[in-house]
C-alpha cells in the first residue's frame, strides 16, 4: 500500500540509581542516554520527519542548567540529535568521561530523566518549532515542563476558543502547544498550592522550594488538564524538579507500554522495543491501561494512577494491522490470522484452481499476513489430498500418490520494492512514470495466460500505488487473472486520532461508493446525507451520530470492489482483476482485544470523531462534489 504518515513514537527512561551505579555496573554513566537511543532507533518506523529528546538533572545548584533539549528534522534526525549531544563531550578527557560525578556536575545530558520523541506530522505543519519535546521554562524548577506525545486532538478549536475567551492569547494554533500551555498553567497552580501550604507550616526561602519539590502532585495536574481533550493520545512529560509521567487516553486508542525494575522505569509506544532494548521477556512488559498514568516522583517512587475513568475499549486495530512492528508476539499471530482467514474467499476467486495459482505479497508489511494465507492454503491442500486418496477404491500406488501429492501450494516473491528509488521520486509531470518503477517483478515466475496471481497487501487506502505501479508491473507477466487481497477490511472513514487520512475523497472505497450512487441515479441519497450531516453538526457534540454511514447502505461490498477495479485499472491493462477484502467479522476474530475499528465501520469512540466525520462529508460535498455535479 501507499505509505501512510501516522502516529508518533515516544520513549521515556527514569534512572532509579545514581549515575555512579551505572558507571560501575555497565562501564558508563551514559547507560540511560544509550538506552534512549536504542528505544528511539527501534521505533524509527513510527516517525521519520523529525526527532527530539530532553533530559533533566536531579542534582544541580543555582546558576547551572538542569534541563536540556535537542531537536532535529529529517529522516536522520535521531542520529543528528545524539551526535550533537556527543559533540558536547568532545573536549572532555577520557578520565572526565569515565567520572560519573564529574559528568553529573559538569556535562549536559548527564541526568536521570530522559524523554525522546519521533515525529510524523498529521497536520501538514513543519519546522523545528513543531518538533517535540516542547519546553516551558520558569525560574522555579518545579514549574518547568517538557512535554511530548503521540496524539491528535479532535476538539482543539473548542479549547483554543475557551482560552481566548478567558483573555489568553496563544502564540501557536496546535494541539501540542495548547496542551503545553494548559498543562503548564495547571502545574503553576499545583506549585502555588504547595507554596501556600509551605507558608502555612512556617517554612521560608529554600525550605519552601524543597517542600514544593517534595510534594508537587503531577496526578492533580493531569486530572485538571486531560479531561478537556477529546482524541487519541499518549502524553509524556518531565518537570524541572524531577517528576515524570506518561498518560494514555481513556478510550485506549493509542498504545503505551512500560517496564520497571530496581534500576529503571521506562515507557515506549511498542512492546518489542522494550523487550529488545532491555533483553526482557514479553510478560515483563505491561500495557498502560486506558485513562491511567505511570508517574515517577522525584524520589524515584513509581506508581500507576487512575486519572480518568476508562470510557471505552477502543484500542486501534489498524495499529495491529499496519503500524506496529510485526515482531510483537501477539501482533505476529494476529496478522497471520488475518491472512489465513482469507483462504476461502481467495479459493472462490480462483475457482479452486490451486494447481495454476501463485501466491505472493506486496512488500513489506504484508509479509506476515502472507504466511498466514500460505498456512490456510496448505491446510486446504492437505484436506484435498486426503479426500482424493480416500476416494480411491484400492490402495494407492506410488505413482498415484506422487500425482496427488504433487499438487502443492505455489508461492513466489513476485513483487520487489526498490527502496532507494523512492527517495528520488520528484514532483511534477515525471512523478507518475518514476512511481511506476518503485516496484519490480521476478521474471519467469508466472506462466503467461495460465497462472492466476494472488497478491496480498496489508490494506488498500487510496489505491494510488496499485494504479500507478503494482497493477502495471503485474500485468507485464500476463497472468490469467490478478487477485489483489487486502488483509484489512475496506477503509471507508477518515481517522482523526493521529493517522494522516482525514479526507473522505482520498479513499478509493468512498469514491467508488459515490460513483455507484451516481450510476444508480441516487443523487437524492447523497443530498440527504449532506443535509443530515449539517443538521447533526448543530447538535451538542455528545449527541452526534455518524450520518456518513448512510452512503454505504445502498451499495454492497462486491459492488464497491468491482467499481474500485474499474476506477484503478491502468490504461492498457487487459488482465482480469478481482479485489478481495477482509470482512469486519474476520477482523474481529483475528484481533479480538483491539476493538477500535472506526476506519472500517464509522464507529468513532469519541464525540469529536463523530463530529469531524460529519464535517468531512460536508467539506467533500461543498469543495469536491459540487464542482463535479450540482444537486
Short names for language-model regions:
Residues 1-289, 295-358, 362-363, 372:
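Conserved short alpha-helical segments that host acidic/polar catalytic motifs at enzyme active sites
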Residues 332-429:
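Conserved PRPP/pyrophosphate-binding segment of the phosphoribosyltransferase/PRPP-pathway fold
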Residues 342, 359, 459-460, 482:
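Hydrophobic, well-ordered secondary-structure elements that form the walls
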Residues 452-469:
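A phosphate-binding catalytic loop at a beta-strand-loop-alpha-helix junction
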Amino acid at each position: 500500500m501507499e505509505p501512510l504518515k501516522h502516529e508518533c513514537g515516544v520513549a521515556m527512561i527514569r534512572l532509579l540509581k545514581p549515575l555512579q551505579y551505572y558507571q560501575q555496573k555497565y562501564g558508563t554513566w551514559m547507560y540511560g542516554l544509550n538506552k534512549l537511543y536504542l528505544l528511539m532507533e527501534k521505533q524509527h518506523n513510527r516517525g521519520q520527519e523529525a526527532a527530539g529528546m530532553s533530559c533533566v538533572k536531579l542534582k544541580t545548584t543555582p546558576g547551572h542548567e538542569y534541563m536540556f533539549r535537542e531537536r532535529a528534522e529529517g529522516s536522520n534526525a535521531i542520529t543528528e540529535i545524539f551526535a550533537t549531544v556527543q559533540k558536547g563531550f568532545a573536549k572532555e578527557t577520557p578520565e572526565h568521561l569515565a567520572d560519573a560525578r564529574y559528568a553529573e556536575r559538569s556535562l549536559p545530558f548527564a541526568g536521570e530523566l530522559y524523554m525522546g520523541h519521533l515525529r510524523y506530522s498529521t497536520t501538514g505543519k513543519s519546522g523545528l518549532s513543531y518538533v517535540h519535546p516542547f519546553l516551558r521554562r520558569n525560574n522555579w524548577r518545579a514549574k518547568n515542563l517538557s512535554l511530548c506525545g503521540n496524539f491528535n486532538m479532535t476538539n482543539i478549536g473548542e479549547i483554543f476558543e475557551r482560552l481566548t475567551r478567558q483573555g489568553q492569547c496563544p502564540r501557536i494554533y496546535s494541539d501540542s502547544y495548547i496542551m503545553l500551555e494548559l498543562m503548564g498553567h495547571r502545574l503553576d497552580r499545583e506549585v502555588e498550592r504547595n507554596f501556600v501550604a509551605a507558608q502555612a507550616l512556617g517554612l521560608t526561602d529554600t525550605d519552601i522550594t524543597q517542600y514544593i519539590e517534595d510534594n508537587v502532585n503531577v496526578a492533580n495536574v493531569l486530572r485538571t488538564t486531560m479531561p478537556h481533550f477529546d482524541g487519541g493520545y499518549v502524553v509524556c512529560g518531565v518537570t524541572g524538579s524531577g517528576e515524570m509521567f506518561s498518560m494514555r487516553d481513556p478510550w485506549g486508542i493509542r498504545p503505551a507500554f512500560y517496564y520497571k525494575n530496581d534500576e529503571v522505569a521506562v515507557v515506549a509506544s511498542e512492546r518489542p522495543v522494550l523487550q529488545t532494548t532491555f533483553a526482557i521477556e514479553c510478560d515483563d512488559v505491561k500495557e498502560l491501561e486506558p485513562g491511567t498514568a505511570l508517574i515517577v516522583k522525584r524520589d524515584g517512587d513509581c506508581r500507576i494512577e487512575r486519572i480518568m475513568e476508562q470510557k471505552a475499549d477502543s484500542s486501534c486495530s489498524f495499529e495491529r494491522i499496519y503500524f506496529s512492528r510485526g515482531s510483537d508476539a501477539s501482533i505476529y499471530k494476529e496478522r497471520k490470522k488475518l491472512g489465513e482467514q482469507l483462504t476461502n474467499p481467495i479459493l472462490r476467486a480462483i475457482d479452486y484452481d490451486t494447481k495454476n495459482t501463485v501466491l505472493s505479497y506486496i512488500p513489506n508489511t504484508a509479509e506476515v499476513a502472507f504466511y498466514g494465507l500460505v498456512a490456510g492454503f496448505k491446510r486446504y491442500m492437505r484436506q484435498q489430498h486426503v479426500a482424493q486418496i480416500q476416494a480411491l477404491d484400492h490402495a494407492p500406488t506410488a505413482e498415484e500418490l506422487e500425482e496427488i501429492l504433487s499438487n502443492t501450494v505455489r508461492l513466489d516473491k513476485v513483487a520487489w520494492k526498490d527502496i532507494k528509488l523512492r527517495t528520488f521520486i520528484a514532483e511534477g509531470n515525471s512523478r507518475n512514470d518514476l512511481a511506476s518503477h518503485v516496484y519490480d517483478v521476478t521474471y519467469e515466475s508466472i506462466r503467461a495466460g495460465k497462472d492466476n496471481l494472488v497478491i496480498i497487501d496489508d490494506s488498500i487506502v487510496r489505491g494510488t500505488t496499485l494504479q500507478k505501479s503494482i497493477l502495471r508491473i503485474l500485468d507485464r507477466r500476463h497472468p490469467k487473472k490478478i487477485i489483489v487481497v487486502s488483509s484489512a477490511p475496506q477503509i471507508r472513514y477518515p481517522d482523526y486520532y493521529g493517522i494522516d487520512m482525514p479526507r473522505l475523497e482520498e479513499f478509493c472505497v468512498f469514491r467508488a461508493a459515490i460513483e455507484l450512487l451516481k450510476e444508480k441515479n441516487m443523487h437524492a441519497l447523497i443530498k440527504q446525507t449532506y443535509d443530515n450531516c449539517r443538521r447533526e453538526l448543530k447538535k451538542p457534540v455528545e449527541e452526534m451520530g455518524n450520518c456518513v454511514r448512510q452512503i454505504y447502505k445502498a451499495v454492497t461490498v462486491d459492488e464497491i470492489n468491482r467499481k474500485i477495479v474499474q476506477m484503478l485499472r491502468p490504461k492498457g491493462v487487459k488482465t482480469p482483476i478481482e479485489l478481495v477484502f477482509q470482512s469486519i467479522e474476520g477482523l474481529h476474530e483475528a484481533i479480538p482485544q483491539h476493538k477500535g475499528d472506526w476506519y472500517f465501520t464509522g464507529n468513532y469512540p469519541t464525540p469529536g470523531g463523530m463530529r469531524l466525520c460529519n464535517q468531512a462529508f460536508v467539506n467533500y460535498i461543498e469543495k469536491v462534489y459540487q464542482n463535479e455535479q450540482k444537486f
